[in-house]
């Protein structure tokens, strides 16, 4: 159980998980309106998201240097920047302006993502308490509330920039909590060495890549699928990312209980299969009800894919190599978090938006039948590092 002392100790990074959930939840619900405003095809919109993804990955690479320079002010500065920069894409009227503006906004959130996860890891290390699943559940709950609220506001006629202005005001209060950061920089870790360690990092990174790709692609395209493919309105479309966020929060809160009874690899394989079934249902649905059910099942399953992979990698490397191993896995995995939406756009352009969710389900089954067994086989050969 999470205690009040745990929350108090982690309040600074937890406020940043709230910030990211609010920003990306609002963005997901605004995708149909933004896409219509800049008047582009699925493929061009996907290309805009890809441009933003490249900037985000670069920002993740630069985040440790920024953290070393700003120290305890890093999270507050990045949270403030992210809240302000998300106003700009809502003002764009064409793809030439939208792509670079979204790049800057996404870059701020990417750097913040790295730092806040490092801070949560530091709190875990100091207190000896697991907090990562709870932190990601906070993100999911904020994402769900924000997506639903933004959809309702869009139904009432609010333009995207007005919605993001409201989120920015809420974010100002959260920045005050981020200023409570008292963490010290993490010590450098030794590099994980040997073929076993490299194989573990590669396999774990691929699992996280697919999991994040499915998660963020659904966040970015579910509202459009519900509205364009199935004829839903703005509020009905916003329920897609909202349902995903809510079920992911439930999945993450309950995931730890499953790990006490089953191995990480077993939970990982079953969760990936469950999320694949949800993706198939959502993609092939002919009505809103089945699509909602599909997104709910997808959210429950995919919510624990990345945490299980992170946990498995961290448990199977030596103490001195753990930080470096998690950093490398993150760089592989988070690329999936950002390439998912543009890949969905390209696939949608080629074969249709519904079938792009079916293709996503196939990728998730690759975890169940290929990557999870390979991780289990490597686990049997002993610890790496």
Report residues per predicted region.
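Helix-to-loop junctions at the C-terminal end of transmembrane segments
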Residues: 57-71, 154, 251-263, 348-349
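Short amphipathic helix-loop junctions that connect adjacent transmembrane helices
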Residues: 29-43, 220-236
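Symmetry-related core transmembrane helices of the 12-TM Major Facilitator Superfamily/SLC fold
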Residues: 161-178, 357-373
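Interfacial helix-cap and linker-helix signal at transmembrane-aqueous boundaries
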Residues: 34-35, 66-67, 152-157, 226-227, ...
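Conserved MFS/SLC helix-loop-helix module at the cytosolic interface between two early adjacent transmembrane helices
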Residues: 58-93
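Intracellular juxtamembrane helix-capping segments at the cytosolic ends
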Residues: 110-125, 304-317
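Structural signature of the two symmetry-related core transmembrane helices
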Residues: 73-87, 266-281
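Helix-loop junctions at membrane interfaces in 12-TM secondary transporters
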Residues: 90-101, 284-294
